[in-house]
Amino acid sequence: MTKKIISLLMIFATLLIITLVSYFHYNQLPIYDINLASKFILNEQTNNDFDEISEILGFDSTDKLLIIHADDLGLCESVNSATFESFENEAISSASVMMTTKEISEVSEFSSKNQNYDLGIHLTVTSEWKYHKWGGILNNEDISSILNKKNHFYWNKRKFTKNGKLNEIRKELQAQVDLGRSMGLNPSHIDSHEGALFFDPDIFKLYLRIAEENDLLAFVPSQASVHFDQNFKKPKHAIIIDQFHMLPEGTEINQIKDYYFNVIENLSPGLSQIIVHLGKDEKELREITIDHPNFDYRWRQLDYDIFNSDEFKNHLKKHDIKIINWKDLKKLI
């Protein structure tokens, strides 16, 4: 009887492990730490003290504070022009810049003429597009653990997480921050392209250390706050976004507008961020996003159209949304 129970428990444990591995693999979540995986499954998130945040920023604790943030600035001319225009139209309040791409000189020029706009560094360690590839800022031999045989970043987060050496990751992340500043950017914060830096405990701590050493804020989506516990307290430079929204992969084109409007209708008091991916339906962007329906040219054109529309801006006013940016949040440190 005892042997039978032990056998059943072993079978159950094996099935549980297989289920967890399959779940994280299917959702492209490279979490290989058992403790972190359990906290993620149990949703053991750390929350902000919003009463303190709202007081420092000059708002009431009942206010709905929202950052409208554009990712991937620098990806190409189409993304750049869409983002620049969205800043000018007050359709977005913040954006972050990929330093590994060819079109960042446009961003540098724009920033030099528009120092009031809020920019961050979009720390990039993956290269997801089918043909449009990039590697790191540093020499290939200095960061070989995070490059494939063609000296491009790996195309997915799993390979980066499994192969990356911490010392090489640290050097590359610092180089990206340094390049941004050398080009005249005055970043307020860092975040992570494809969230690649959020899943491994040591890499996540490194990400936060880069923020602290450079006096920058670190974007931490609520899902990643499971890293924090009694043994690892949240550092002051880490800003947890309690309500984090980004268009889910697989969303049908005809559902995109409803998704964003529903997000606004259902925002609760507190600190929120919507991440958008802006672009224009042009030949360049179509070629970059080929065979990649998520975040492709159609998504990006719709993001641009929706957030620049009077209808959406009126929707924000109707629900009394207070728009802020990452520069505002620097008051917290």
Residue ranges and their predicted role:
Residues 165-244, 248-257, 265, 305:
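Catalytic domains of cell-wall/extracellular-matrix polysaccharide-remodeling enzymes
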